[in-house]
Amino acid sequence: MAVYVVTGKLGAGKTLVAVSRIQRTLAKGGIVATNLNLKLHHFPQVGRYAKQCRVMRIADKPTLEDLESIGRGNLTYDESKNGLLVLDECGTWFNSRNWSDKSRQPVIDWCLHARKLGWDIIFIIQDISLMDKQARDALAEHVVYCRRLDKLNIPIIGGLISVLSGGRLPLPKVHFGIVKYGDNPQSLTVDKWVYTGTDLYAAYDTKQIFTSDREISPPYCPLSPYYTHGIFSVKRDAKYYMRMTKIYFKKMNRVFLMASFLALGAACGIFYKSQAYSNQLQHIQDNSKTSVISKTDQSAEILPRLSINSYSQMGYDVSVTFKDAKAKIYNSFDLIKDGYRVDIKDACHVTIVKKSYIQQITCEG
């Protein structure tokens, strides 16, 4: 069994953190008992179509009879399936000032046996010191210290921005729950709960006033969201979205719509033209590269004017050397390796061919 005492200043997000744990328990199919006014259809992980949400709303300031009426939270020995009991504003009815209240001890005794009944407990209170000392020593297994990021200030940077702009540096509204093992602020940190919480604001009554009048806040079990909202909800199929689209189009200014469509058409035209220009430019660049390569290859194939320098034959092997005007020697075997075809008619008549290039070579040059 886990018992958490959630503490924090006013507006620090204590109830929000507890409601997030309630949502987690309901999503797993567990049982929840609480003195909070919940709006089950606004839980994102539950939704308005859930048919089996087991929630019990007990009195604002519960007595032993209220706690006994919720029964067992888990019938198995698997503690991960325990139910969750959430009690808010414990500082008004579970505080150290009312230590002489005769109904206090039976409630503490029940909480001590909550593990055997299959319940995890979350007490919500402004400060752990406000809690009854006997209950604090016996039950405060984990203490959660809640903080809000948007109420903090970044050192140096926040001060500079405040001086320059006249306002605080806006930080995101993120809620932190630092879980300590024990009621000492220096105890070991065992977990950290982080929530933005914006999707849970509508899931509970943030302005709920707790009273001891049982006629105003009697115990009851709320119906599952399907029977209060889901069964009356409009089915969100394709027809629904088409109808909503038509309604929004009618509500919007026709001149604005026409301007939007004209702007969209102009943007599409500019994009099409830019793509066509880009493709044309790429085509021109490719053609220029091809022409340069072909000219380079063609110039590389042209040989200077040659004349036969020597001719030798041994059996079927014929070797011919050529020379140009600068007396540079070219061997027939080297020309063949470079891709030229050497046709030898006789010792004074040789033809060199490569693609469209042809040169007739004789002994006179």
UniProtKB/Swiss-Prot annotation:
Principal cellular location given in the protein's record: host cell
GO MF annotation terms: ATP binding
Disulfide cysteine pairs (residue numbers): none
Compartments reported by the entry: Host membrane
Assigned GO CC terms: host cell membrane; membrane
GO biological process: viral extrusion
Positions that bind ATP: 8-15
Keyword terms: ATP-binding, Host membrane, Membrane, Nucleotide-binding, Transmembrane, Transmembrane helix, Viral extrusion, Viral release from host cell
Bilayer disposition of the protein: Single-pass membrane protein
Keyword flag Nucleotide-binding: yes
Cited Pfam families: Zot (PF05707)
Cited InterPro entries: P-loop_NTPase (IPR027417), Zot_N (IPR008900)
Membrane-spanning intervals of the chain: 255-272
Record's subunit section: Interacts with G4P; this interaction results in a complex that spans the inner an outer host membranes.
Family the UniProt entry places it in: Belongs to the inovirus G1P protein family.
Reported function: Isoform G1P plays an essential role in phage assembly. It is required to increase the number of adhesion zones between the inner and outer membranes of the host cell. The extrusion of neo-synthesized phages occurs at these adhesion sites. May be involved with G4P in creating zone through which the phage assembled and extruded.
Annotated protein name in UniProt: Gene 1 protein
